[in-house]
């Protein structure tokens, strides 16, 4: 089995928002809270924070996590092993954007590389993601929804076609943690439709039910 690239996963990647911006500071706050609070609670909009700014800051965090995952499977997800971007036998994905509006078939690695660059361009575009406190444009949220739908496709491909690779190298816990963060975020802000997430419906159901049971147990213990 080919090795997974679990080191240097930020090589060639740049932080798309300025380090001095409010969005970047919120990104650090959101990232820190992931280690100190339940994931479902950590994505909720804090009191007094602009909704779009909070969404933008979390998108930076989700993007970091996506880059890690894409980099981790670079050596096992290739043009030869994954010539088609898909999530199982019956779900395949094409790529389209403003420059090439006609959907085109693509390999999984090409889709993921294109998505990383596309997201990087979006997050660094000050007209779409203002870092100076200016109002967010109407195009911001539709673009976030488009990106989140595509982020999900990468997770679906990773789980369905490469989960054994993550297990083999002991990285499945990291994958699960990142996906749960993504899942609770898109559910909290209604960013990805249920039908779009159907390839991982059973996994999502398991995560939600397990989390509900754990929260119920925790609440019962605290009341004793």
Model-derived regions: residue spans:
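The feature captures two recurrent sequence modes
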Residues: 1-101
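Helix N-terminus capping/helix-initiation residues
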Residues: 50, 106-107, 193
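Amphipathic alpha-helical interface segments within eukaryotic helical scaffold
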Residues: 67-143, 148-152, 156-159
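Charged/polar positions within long, soluble alpha-helices
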Residues: 124-127, 156-164, 184-194
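Short amphipathic alpha-helical segments embedded in low-complexity Lys/Glu-rich regions
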Residues: 132-141, 164-176, 198-203
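Extracellular/luminal segments of secreted precursors and ectodomains of membrane proteins
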Residues: 150, 165, 178-182
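Eukaryote-biased recognition of C-terminal alpha-helical segments
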Residues: 171-224
């Amino acid at each position: 089995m080919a090795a997974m690239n679990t080191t240097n996963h930020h090589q060639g990647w740049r932080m798309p928002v300025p380090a001095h911006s409010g969005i970047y500071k919120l990104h650090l706050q959101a990232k820190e809270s992931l280690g100190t609070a339940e994931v479902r609670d950590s994505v909720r909009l804090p009191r007094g924070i602009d909704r779009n700014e909070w969404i933008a800051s979390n998108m930076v965090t989700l993007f970091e996590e996506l880059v890690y995952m894409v980099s981790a499977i670079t050596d096992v997800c290739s043009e030869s092993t994954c010539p088609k971007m898909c999530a199982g036998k019956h779900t395949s994905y094409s790529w389209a954007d403003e420059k090439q509006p006609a959907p085109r078939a693509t390999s999984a690695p090409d889709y993921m590389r294109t998505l990383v660059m596309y997201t990087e361009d979006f997050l660094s575009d000050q007209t779409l993601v203002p870092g100076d406190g200016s109002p967010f444009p109407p195009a911001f949220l539709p673009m976030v929804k488009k990106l989140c739908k595509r982020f999900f496709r990468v997770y679906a491909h990773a789980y369905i076609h490469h989960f054994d690779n993550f297990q083999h190298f002991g990285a499945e816990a990291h994958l699960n943690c990142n996906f749960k963060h993504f899942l609770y975020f898109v559910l909290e802000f209604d960013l990805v439709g249920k039908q779009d997430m159907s390839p991982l419906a059973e996994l999502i159901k398991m995560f939600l039910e397990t989390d509900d049971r754990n929260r119920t147990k925790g609440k019962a213990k605290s009341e004793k």
